Amino acid sequence: MSASSTDSTEIHISGIARDSIVDGEGIRLTVFTQGCPRRCPGCHNPDTQPLVGGRMTTVGAVLAELDENPLLTGLTLSGGEPFLQPAALLPLARGAHARGLDVWSYTGYTLEELRAQENPAVDALLDELDVLVDGDYREEERDLTLHFRGSRNQRVIDLAATRATGTLRLLYKDE
C-alpha cells in the first residue's frame, strides 16, 4: 500500500502481538495502547495502565506489520484504553480496512459512555470499527467460558450490524 500523510501519526503503545487468536475472531495483529485510567482490579494487562512507559510508534510502522503477515484477518486495538487516543488510532483502523481486514477494539467504557462524550474523534473511531468489546473488567463477574471477554458485564458489540439496523446487535448473545 502506498504511504499517506497519516503514516507519521504517532501512537503510544505498550506492545504488539503479531499473531493473536484470543483478541477477536481469526488471526489478528493486536496493538496494546499505553495508559488507562480505569484501574480495574484483576486487569489482564496492568502494565499498560500507567500513562508513562511503553513506547511511541507510528501508524505507518503498524501498517507495515500488517502487510508482513498475509495470514492476518484483522486488527485489534486493546490496552490500556484505546479511546484515550482515538485520533491517532483512526488512521490505523482505516488503513486496516483498506487492506481488507476487520477491526475490533476493547474498551473499559460502555458504548453509551463513549457516545455521551460527544467527542468527534471518539465518534469517528467508533464509526470505523467492526466490533467493540465494551465495559470494565469485573473480577466478581469473571467467566473464562465467554468469547473474547473476561467478565459477564462486558459486551461484544457488532458495530457494523448496529449501524446497519439502528439497533444494538451483540455477537455471542446467548452467553
Residues of each region from the PLM?
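Receiver (REC) domain switch/active-site residues of two-component response regulators
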Residues: D130
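Residues at the C-termini of beta-strands that transition into short coil/loop
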Residues: A17, D136, A160
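Conserved Radical SAM active-site core
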Residues: S8-S14, I27, N45-L125
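N-terminal [4Fe-4S]-dependent radical SAM core
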Residues: M1-F32, P41, N45-L51, L168-R169, ...
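Short glycine-rich anion-binding loops that position phosphate/pyrophosphate groups of nucleotides
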Residues: P82, Y137-R138
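Conserved C-terminal portion of the radical SAM core fold
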Residues: N69-L77, V133-D136, R163-E175
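P-loop/Walker A phosphate-binding loop and immediately adjacent motor/lid segment at beta-alpha junctions
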Residues: Q85-H97, W104, R142-E175
